[in-house]
Amino acid sequence: MSDSDKELENQIIEAGEKLIDPPSSLDELLSFLDKLFVSLAEVEQSPPDSMQNALTPLMKGLVGGKLFKHSDVDVKVAVAACISEITRITAPDAPYDDDQMKEVFKLIVSSFEDLVDKSSRSYAKRISILETVAKVRSCVVMLDLECDALLIEMFQHFLKAIRDHHSGNVFSSMENIMTLVLEESEDIPSEMLSPILHSVKKDDEISQVSRRLAEQVLSNCASKLKTYLTEAVKSSGVPLDKYSNIVASICEGTFSALQQDQVVANEKEDSQGHIKRETEVEKAAEISTPERTDAPKDESGKSGVSNGVAQQNDSSVDTDSMKKQDDTGAKDEPQQLDNPRNTDLNNTTEEKPDVEHQIEEKENESSSVKQADLSKDSDIKEETEPAELLDSKDVLTSPPVDSSVTAATSSENEKNKSVQILPSKTSGDETANVSSPSMAEELPEQSVPKKTANQKKKESSTEEVKPSASIATEEVSEEPNTSEPQVTKKSGKKVASSSKTKPTVPPSKKSTSETKVAKQSEKKVVGSDNAQESTKPKEEKKKPGRGKAIDEESLHTSSGDNEKPAVSSGKLASKSKKEAKQTVEESPNSNTKRKRSLGQGKASGESLVGSRIKVWWPMDQAYYKGVVESYDAAKKKHLVIYDDGDQEILYLKNQKWSPLDESELSQDEEAADQTGQEEDASTVPLTKKAKTGKQSKMDNSSAKKGSGAGSSKAKATPASKSSKTSQDDKTASKSKDSKEASREEEASSEEESEEEEPPKTVGKSGSSRSKKDISSVSKSGKSKASSKKKEEPSKATTSSKSKSGPVKSVPAKSKTGKGKAKSGSASTPASKAKESASESESEETPKEPEPATKAKSGKSQGSQSKSGKKRKR
């Protein structure tokens, strides 16, 4: 334990002792609670036993009567902030029993009441409580405890307190909490929907940001709310046309069609805007002599050029947000993308009236929900089109500049650590094992489309050099659910069995994908636009106990298919590992709110059956790929079969998962093609050797009898091969009659060899080439020469005696390698010719059983890999 951890434990212990008799002075008490909150914020989740023991008296003291029911509001908020940190530390376990947790939730919900007061002393603590509740998902525990009244009160506080001056993090936290409560509720009462419906009325008294929050929540839960929303509207007694258009579209079942129409309209407007921007760029290039120097000074004008893209101050809210990103100064809350009106906080006061005027015009033309969706979609399009000129602005692939942007999104007390989730008692282990999207929620929504833009660029650059790769990518996108899982499993076995004597790399769940990524990394050399993607995090969580070996030889093979110059295996392995890490690190970030509303909503039906997805395992800290095999409509659960053969029945709404994107599917398809080529290549020598037929088997057995060194020694050096080949040529020039006679003699010797020794022994000795055998080949150079001399007379006696009667002593002598030829037995020229031919054949034939042994070792290796214990979820 480090000194800082020990010091932190001492601070926690002292605070717990002080809570027994807290300071009587209000100022001293608030100062003490402030220090305690800072100390608790430094404690990591799931701490060691010593820290848990130090926290025990502190946890009891915080729920004591003196502090818990204090009359001062700031003291209550400070206590609630400390308790919310404790719920984060102890997650996924609740820190208190059910009755105490109900009281804790009352205190937490009461702290949300004055979120509107930004000048309050406790404002930062209120924001911290809000973010912690969203991350730990403790609102699900409120559902389990049937705290419906508290949930309704919390909804009311959110919709009343939200303001334009709040950061995007506040807006997204409120949205996530409300969406989660509605999605996880088995039955949604009309009282819970009442504050949301009140906020979407066509009433001037309701603030625009409150209406936008309510509409966003309704949009996220549209599929589930159809029945409940209709009943709530009827019970309210307010006509349907008095509400926002999104309410009518959900009740009438036209919400999905409305979204599709909106997307089409956005694409048309975007294409027209793109043409206008190109003409603006040309005009600006002709008018302004120094483009780069004049553009920043021309901010108050109608157009300016930044990175080659014309931007207009009064064109739209989205254009202003683009200008904000191009600005090199400090940026304010990137997640204000969810709140389009707040994206202009850094602009000058002269620009704000124009922006508000544009928003009002849009609201007159269409509904509020259309305006919100339009601003998001067009913002995404604005950034996707000039992606080639704005690569440095990419959120997912940019260098450490983006880390400061991500840090800006957090509040004063935001911590860069993973947060587990409090489990739902009804959902059991399923919810307990789901990790909250900690960093994914902090990233702006541009991250997903920008990633897509980079993928498109990569595909286009790859198409110029290798059209076949692009065709494979298209096939994967068209048929992602057919043969992909089986091919992936085959490729995993192939990699595992490709080498027997090489040292293996430490195994991971993604072992098969590393070889796939090695192939992709070569393509990224061609697509130079994506060179910056190599700067990725250098740590990868590995799944324990899942042993699938990867050797350097297999990495060479996978990269060699691209006809690139041979690279050292160390560099190639490191490059492929970086790419695999990129896949692991990027996927949590892509699970944003927008993707949740469109993608994760599918988990309630059968539309996911047959899809390739990846599921987050919090204990292993890794994503595992699999296929959605089936869906149980009664239980609303999916059967997921992982690539390693494991099966799970999951309630996907409680899991952290995401469908495989095009890049990952294309990697799988490329690996499948590569595996097919390897299998075809491995079968070609087998068929060639099979043509030798009976003779190769016969030569194998006779060589075993004569040499006494086993067929594993029959693999000679190239020099010996050439000498024997020349000897073959000489003997082949002899008469054809002698060859026919020798064939008959060998047929009889084959029968004797089969009687003496079962075929199993030959197969095993021929195929098992251990390190000991390999070393014996090099050591027995001299014994080979003598064994060859012994081989000729021994074979001659075998063939000559085979006609007269059974041979007993000769095979026994030849097996030990000590048998000597009888002086009286003279070998005929025909037998000599056949001996030399059999020697040359034995040079080649022992390679034949190798694939069988490979298959055996592959099976044993596969069984070993599956025997590794997977951490229980």
From Swiss-Prot:
Official protein name in the record: Sister chromatid cohesion protein PDS5 homolog C
Acidic residues: compositionally biased ranges: 661-681, 747-757
Compartments where found: Nucleus
Segments of this protein annotated with the region Disordered: 266-611, 658-873
Organism superkingdom: Eukaryota
Assigned protein family: Belongs to the PDS5 family.
Composition-biased stretches (Polar residues): 303-319, 336-348, 400-411, 418-438
Extent of Basic and acidic residues compositional bias: 266-301, 320-334, 349-365, 373-394, 456-466, 511-526, 535-555, 726-746, 844-853
GN (gene name): PDS5C
Subunit annotation: Interacts with the cohesin complex.
Functional note: Cohesin cofactor dispensable during the meiotic division but playing an important role in DNA repair by homologous recombination (HR) probably by helping SMC5/SMC6 complex. Regulator of sister chromatid cohesion in mitosis which may stabilize cohesin complex association with chromatin. May couple sister chromatid cohesion during mitosis to DNA replication. Cohesion ensures that chromosome partitioning is accurate in both meiotic and mitotic cells and plays an important role in DNA repair.
Source organism (scientific name): Arabidopsis thaliana
